[in-house]
């Protein structure tokens, strides 16, 4: 059974505190937009789809609380301004993740249109917001399962031409249930392969410096009893070079895909794409359409978040033998005191290194001109 990282029911929101994983599984309450902002900024929740969902739901919880307390204005214009201000605030928690900005824009548009509707009130606006927020959670899970099915089919069709019924896959960072409403994007593809008895082995990278692969992806893989092996980031080249490894594909997620296919994802993704190209391994990006930013022409325009030097120079975990005791978490220094640190959270993989982008509407490959064209994905009249 897949993990449930986000629990939302009866206008109550809880998330797994991912800072404590894999040692302690604890759900923490999110009671306001401010709580949501801090959870995202502090990486208690991460993964582009999950960030957007938690942000939107955190405001839903706050609006519900205001309404229950009898403090909600009857004016839809006044409530609308409050919601829009909170949405803008939430976007500042993680500027690289396009899903968050995209969700905020959509909800802002919904709010603006609702306030112009005849008979609109503060109460009706909040009701509309809550309904859309809940649908967002449902749709993300459905989209992820479609991504998984499309991606698994694409990989297996190509593996079959080489006589392979089962495949080995490499993934980076965490793109599973912990990064989404459930099931996952890139890890959803791997999960679909496993469910179809077509996964021989998945390799997951440690994903320095924040160790999302070692802490989170490995946690999910062990939880679901998938055949899995953890490697450090620097071992990927050696893995691909081993004839017996037979890695069919590298599948990663995305925080933002530019209009030309350039993809911002966790630092280290670009290096894996270069390795894949050299070794003739398919390199795939798995992401919902909300991650595709058609307003950003290329990766050159993507803002890359830089994080604290301490994430590189220190590491946090429990003392060996005391796993499970949250009070025994220790921070250990790894690097020489005084060394300068550069710590970008993401890098941009050029579209030229990406073989395909897997979405909930299907797999997009480059056209005859050698470029990605995503417009058809957004044509609601076209079939999936």
Curated annotation (Swiss-Prot):
Pfam families: IF-2B (PF01008)
Entry keyword set: Amino-acid biosynthesis, Cytoplasm, Isomerase, Methionine biosynthesis, Nucleus
Gene3D superfamilies: translation initiation factor eif-2b, domain 1 (1.20.120.420), Translation initiation factor eif-2b, domain 2 (3.40.50.10470)
Superkingdom: Eukaryota
Active-site residues annotated for this sequence: 255
Any Gene Ontology biological process: L-methionine salvage from methylthioadenosine
Catalytic activity: 5-(methylsulfanyl)-alpha-D-ribose 1-phosphate = 5-(methylsulfanyl)-D-ribulose 1-phosphate
Function field: Catalyzes the interconversion of methylthioribose-1-phosphate (MTR-1-P) into methylthioribulose-1-phosphate (MTRu-1-P).
Name assigned to this protein: Methylthioribose-1-phosphate isomerase
Lineage: Eukaryota, Fungi, Dikarya, Ascomycota, Pezizomycotina
